Curated annotation (Swiss-Prot):
The modification N-acetylalanine is found at residue 2. One of its GO terms (molecular function) is metal ion binding. This is Inosine triphosphate pyrophosphatase. The keyword ATP-binding does not apply. It is found in: Cytoplasm. Its cofactor is Mg(2+); Mn(2+). HAMAP family: HAM1_NTPase (MF_03148).
Amino acid sequence: MAASLVGKKIVFVTGNAKKLEEVIQILGDKFPCTLVAQKIDLPEYQGEPDEISIQKCQEAARQVQGPVLVEDTCLCFNALGGLPGPYIKWFLQKLKPEGLYQLLAGFEDKSAYALCTFALSTGDPSQPVLLFRGKTPGQIVMPRGSRDFGWDPCFQPDGYEQTYAEMPKAEKNTISHRFRALFKLQEYFGVTDGAGDH
């Protein structure tokens, strides 16, 4: 499947300009396909993260009638059995980063993990959707740093004193869940030389 996509345009399903910018920055100029952002209204699927990613990708490929890349991000609180998980977008809209932190007020365990899944389809419904996952463990903390990128202010990756929002973008882009998932996508296309050395 990788060979059939080389040199082609892949629609990256997002309406978020910051997300597109981050993905392109992480993939770098050796990535053999051109990503073109397109906002597509997809149903809000429910289920486990992999199921949601596959369903979203299949529906996006059906609408685009060609190759698509869909990203799904989860923020999973261990004390809450993995919630909010794939529903983080809705929790964040209602609660803001402060509310996410307050959700864990009654729990000693503030550990969490950020999970990013990229789902890739050639656009051919007979071909399986491929999944590329990245996971970063961390803690949910009182929000700190810039407020321009989702829940970044309240997620502090393990081994760091800063939240994602406080980190320079270049540093975040070498440790984040999104970076780890995109690294696997790069490996699939055989273009990782040096990508993991940042």
